[in-house]
Amino acid sequence: MAKEPLIRVLLIEDDPMVQEVNRMFVEKLSGFTIVGTTATGEEGMVKTRELQPDLILLDIFMPKQDGLSFIKQIREQYIDVDIIAVTAANDTKTIKTLLRYGVMDYLVKPFTFERLKAALTQYEEMFRKMQKEAELSQDSLDEMIKQKQAQANMDDLPKGLHAHTLQQVIERLEELDEPKSAEEIGRDVGLARVTVRRYLNYLESVGQVEMDLTYGSIGRPIQTYKLKQG
């Protein structure tokens, strides 16, 4: 069986220290290879044409040409490359713009290796599926869209909720084998129960989480939560 080709990644980041950390993170993962690095949007455009990467890990806030204008130029010129955005901002305006330009994912600085790993793993699944299948079934499309649903819900968060924290809660819910209470989830992610409950209530309101009541032998029932299936 032929070995699958590595996914070619270009890193565009103006902070040398962050650039090196990102490089080390990506190189920890099988299936990916770094084909180039650059610190500016202008040089990034040159290297994108020259190296023809499959994926760009793109910093949004850079001097001269920032990431948003870089993405706009890429889309206007119909350059065939996917982008994962890296940003210090989690305001809805920036996130809406990134989503409209078709980024595959966005990572809010500072992010963990586990968060980047999750983003790249999801991207690799989509990338391999697109390579193998000339046409996608409805089930395949549904699964891909479902995976991006968590990102889409961050498009318009209520006041006081933050995309990075919401992502933490969602990631913990994805790991659960059985429903858990807000207190248990909060303990797992290092957040107060009342804080976690606000995010769980939001996820329930947008149809992404199911809440159920668990009755013990005494006392009031406990609200437990799990991701909605299907």
From Swiss-Prot:
Ranges of residues in domain Response regulatory: 8-124
Record-level Gene Ontology MF annotations: DNA binding; DNA-binding transcription factor activity; phosphorelay response regulator activity
Residue list for modification 4-aspartylphosphate: 59
Alphabetical UniProt keywords: Activator, Cytoplasm, DNA-binding, Phosphoprotein, Transcription, Transcription regulation, Two-component regulatory system
Pfam families tied to this protein: Response_reg (PF00072)
DNA-binding region of this protein: 183-209
Compartments it resides in: Cytoplasm
Name of the featured protein: Probable C4-dicarboxylate response regulator DctR
InterPro entries assigned: 2C-system_Tx_regulators (IPR051271), CheY-like_superfamily (IPR011006), Sig_transdc_resp-reg_cit/mal (IPR024187), Sig_transdc_resp-reg_receiver (IPR001789), WH-like_DNA-bd_sf (IPR036388), WH_DNA-bd_sf (IPR036390)
A GO CC term assigned to this protein in UniProt: cytoplasm
Function: Member of the two-component regulatory system DctS/DctR. Essential for expression of DctP.
Gene: dctR
PROSITE patterns (UniProt xref): RESPONSE_REGULATORY (PS50110)
Post-translational modification, as annotated: Phosphorylated by DctS.
CDD domains: REC_citrate_TCS
